């Protein structure tokens, strides 16, 4: 059994990317895995201020909902991100969370598998490429992990 965290980054109620996140979570549960589905909707996530205190102390000085999410990511075997595509890129809230998880960088982490679920109004093959590239930049900082899959649902 693996520990799976699915992070839905859309703030819109009933969003397409949240629907994908729910289905991924249901599939993982049906396969016998322990799943935590986290929606950023309603969460307080402030911007990184670039102070780098986290690199010295191992903790971010900003008080909001990020530390709890980060702890779940650190302890997960699988991380799945779900995001709408805005201007051919991941959502701003996803990027903000990734930036804030800078405190994870020097820590031990369990995740080896990362998945990406994306949705967009446009349906062309190139639409999700920059979002994937942005996430791959984060994954590259965690050498034991890799992008195992990306599902794009366009035209929605």
Which role does the model predict for each range below?
Residues 79-92, 126-135, 154-156:
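Short secondary-structure transition/capping segments
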Residues 9, 40, 118-121, 153:
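Cofactor-binding loop segments of dinucleotide-utilizing enzymes, especially the Rossmann-like FAD-
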Residues 92, 105-149:
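Short, glycine-/small-residue-rich phosphate/pyrophosphate-handling segment
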Residues 34-38, 144-154:
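Short beta-strand elements in bilobed, periplasmic/extracellular small-molecule ligand-binding domains
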Residues 2-5, 78, 115-116, 151-156:
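A short small-residue
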Residues 1-104:
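N-terminal beta1-alpha1-beta2 submodule of the flavodoxin-like/Rossmannoid cofactor-binding fold
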């Amino acid at each position: 059994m693996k520990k799976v965290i699915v992070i839905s980054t859309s703030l819109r109620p009933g969003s397409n990317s949240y629907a994908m996140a729910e289905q991924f979570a249901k599939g993982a549960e049906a396969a016998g895995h322990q799943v935590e589905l986290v929606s950023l909707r309603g969460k307080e996530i402030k911007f990184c201020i670039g102070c780098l205190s986290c690199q010295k102390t191992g903790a971010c000085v900003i008080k909001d909902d990020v530390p709890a999410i980060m702890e779940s990511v650190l302890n997960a075997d699988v991380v799945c991100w779900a995001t709408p595509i805005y201007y051919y890129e991941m959502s701003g809230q996803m990027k903000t969370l990734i930036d804030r998880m800078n405190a994870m960088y020097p820590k031990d982490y369990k995740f080896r598998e990362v998945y990406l679920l994306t949705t967009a109004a446009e349906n062309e093959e190139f639409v999700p490429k920059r979002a994937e590239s942005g996430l791959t930049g984060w994954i590259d900082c965690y050498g034991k992990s890799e992008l195992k899959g990306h599902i794009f649902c366009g035209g929605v």
